[in-house]
Amino acid sequence: MITPRPLGLYLHIPFCVKKCAYCDFYSITDASRMDAFTDALIRSIREYGEKSAGRTTDTVYLGGGTPSYLGGARLERILHAVRENFALAENTEITVECNPESTDAVLLDALRRGGANRLSFGVQAAHDNELRRIGRIHDFAKAKNAVLLAHEHGFSNISLDLMYGLPGQTQDMFLDSLAQCLALQPTHLSCYGLKLEPMTEMGREAPVLPDND
């Protein structure tokens, strides 16, 4: 008898304070819809949990959007629903994407109670002028403090996202951002090149980007 492969569960949390200038993922800013969304998502979790009976799940990923903007109480409800309706493997990795601006002690405590064991922070750059150019709502000091706070709250598995090819960015600036992110001792670091999508703010404006050299 062939044993079914473990499942990977992705939950999209579409809410953002504002849309970043480069982002083409689906997102909304209407926070008044958060409670209704959470209730609907939990109903879907129960439905799909029934359909997955007999299979284990070894990865759970809450992406967005900005999952942390949903708030600790709602995220804790969602994470508990996942645990109650899916057969999680003993070492299941449960990741929640966090924006530094919406990360605080209350959120981190709720994520711990919900069973999250990995956080992913969209740092993107260590220079505030670069962050402003791409429409990020946080500065690097806020990002640094959020990562340190996560460590203090017991999260040892932390991933950071960093971008290169930003408008006005030099190679030295990127390398400095890389060094400052590595100094935060993440478990994982992802580097992404800026891609101008046509339906985004930056795609419509077509800023001058660094050359490939």
Question: Which ranges hold each PLM region?
Answer:
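C-terminal scaffold of the Radical SAM
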Residues: 2-8, 27-51, 55-213
